[in-house]
Amino acid sequence: MTNIRKSHPLIKIINQSFIDLPAPSNISSWWNFGSLLGICLALQIVTGLFLAMHYTSDTDTAFNSVSHMCRDVNYGWVLRYLHANGASMFFICLYLHVGRGIYYGSYMFKETWNMGVILLFAVMATAFLGYVLPWGQMSFWGATVITNLLSAIPYVGTDLVTWIWGGFAVDKATLTRFFAFHFLFPFIIAALVMVHLLFLHETGSNNPTGIPSNMDMIPFHPYYTIKDILGLFMMILVLLCLVMFSPDLLGDPDNYTPANPLSTPPHIKPEWYFLFAYAILRSIPNKLGGVLALVFSILILFIFPLLHTSKQRSMTFRPFSQCLFWLLVADLLTLTWIGGQPVEQPYIIIGQLASILYFLIIIVMMPLTSLMENHLMKW
């Protein structure tokens, strides 16, 4: 009799994806973040569902409904802070996952990579919508400033902003539709994740050497299930430390003040995970130029396969490319710091230099360095 795991039409799909899946024997802990992202998504959907049961998407009651959750609902504060800090963990895992892909040349799986970049855009959009919902000062002004960027689009910009707002300012209609879309998007993301995995399982995983590993595969279960569970425990430990000891560490104190259209906060800034893009936006004095730089700072990920000039796939054996990669990481950390600072010198010039360096490293320096390494290897 055939094992039901291998014969049942539905269980067979799960078996081929998570149990009997052939995986390279040498993939490191950097390959753990895919499973952690799946768990983050599940956590966000579950906590978000319970939060939605108590939330009201009306400008008069939204702030108070969030306050009521934290004060009067059994363990409501745990749900709220798991959801807020879960988003931070989501982005930490996302950025590490993308960084791993760049370092080890995983972007050469073009379909998987492109799907991943689309997923990154979807998660960023969802996080932005979610940040508006508590209807604090930073929620309101963040929504106003970021949606207003669309007015930089020629001809249709102003009409587009009015259409998104549902009026002539961020108000009840805006909050209601943002809540509707924030609820809907995670399920779309879950569907996109399925497509991402479908493309990945067509080619199999990459590995740290960048060399095809078809000759040396091991089953995903139990080897990598155990490894993923270890990563899961470590992530949960960090998340619970955040939630239990300093739940507001990554948030903004201004969001504990109810939204007031008549009073602008001294420094409008998004959540920490958008600060690098916000710094690039602010570093260009022209509005349309800033918006284009903001969009291209993420869109640039799509052209990584086109910019790959090395004869080797991975950076494991390419020390010069490694130096550039870590320079890029340092540059992104600098941009994140600048995004949280006021618009004054010396922060303005540092932000402008870091923004130029970001695009320069990716578009010019990395491809040229790869060509130089090819020459040094006499390839």
UniProtKB/Swiss-Prot annotation:
Needed co-factor(s): heme b
Residues that coordinate or bind heme b b566: H97, H196
Keywords, sorted A to Z: Electron transport, Heme, Iron, Membrane, Metal-binding, Mitochondrion, Mitochondrion inner membrane, Respiratory chain, Transmembrane, Transmembrane helix, Transport, Ubiquinone
A GO cellular component annotation in the UniProt record: mitochondrial inner membrane
Chain residues that bind heme b b562: H83, H182
Ligand binding (a ubiquinone): H201
InterPro entries referenced in this protein's UniProt entry, alphabetically: Cyt_b/b6_C (IPR005798), Cyt_b/b6_C_sf (IPR036150), Cyt_b/b6_N (IPR005797), Cytb/b6-like_sf (IPR027387), Cytochrome_b (IPR030689), Cytochrome_b_C_euk/bac (IPR048260), Cytochrome_b_N_euk/bac (IPR048259), Di-haem_cyt_TM (IPR016174)
GO terms of biological process kind: mitochondrial electron transport, ubiquinol to cytochrome c
Cofactor note: Binds 2 heme b groups non-covalently.
Subcellular location as annotated: Mitochondrion inner membrane
Main location: mitochondrion
SUPFAM superfamilies for this protein: a domain/subunit of cytochrome bc1 complex (Ubiquinol-cytochrome c reductase), Transmembrane di-heme cytochromes
Topology within the bilayer: Multi-pass membrane protein
Membrane-spanning parts: 33-53, 77-98, 113-133, 178-198, 226-246, 288-308, 320-340, 347-367
Alphabetized GO MF terms: metal ion binding; ubiquinol-cytochrome-c reductase activity
Source species, domain of life: Eukaryota
Record's subunit section: The cytochrome bc1 complex contains 11 subunits: 3 respiratory subunits (MT-CYB, CYC1 and UQCRFS1), 2 core proteins (UQCRC1 and UQCRC2) and 6 low-molecular weight proteins (UQCRH/QCR6, UQCRB/QCR7, UQCRQ/QCR8, UQCR10/QCR9, UQCR11/QCR10 and a cleavage product of UQCRFS1). This cytochrome bc1 complex then forms a dimer.
Similarity-based family: Belongs to the cytochrome b family.
Other noteworthy facts: Heme 1 (or BL or b562) is low-potential and absorbs at about 562 nm, and heme 2 (or BH or b566) is high-potential and absorbs at about 566 nm.
UniProt-listed PANTHER family: CYTOCHROME B (PTHR19271:SF16)
Function, in words: Component of the ubiquinol-cytochrome c reductase complex (complex III or cytochrome b-c1 complex) that is part of the mitochondrial respiratory chain. The b-c1 complex mediates electron transfer from ubiquinol to cytochrome c. Contributes to the generation of a proton gradient across the mitochondrial membrane that is then used for ATP synthesis.
Protein name: Cytochrome b
Taxonomic source organism: Vespertilio murinus
Encoding gene (name): MT-CYB
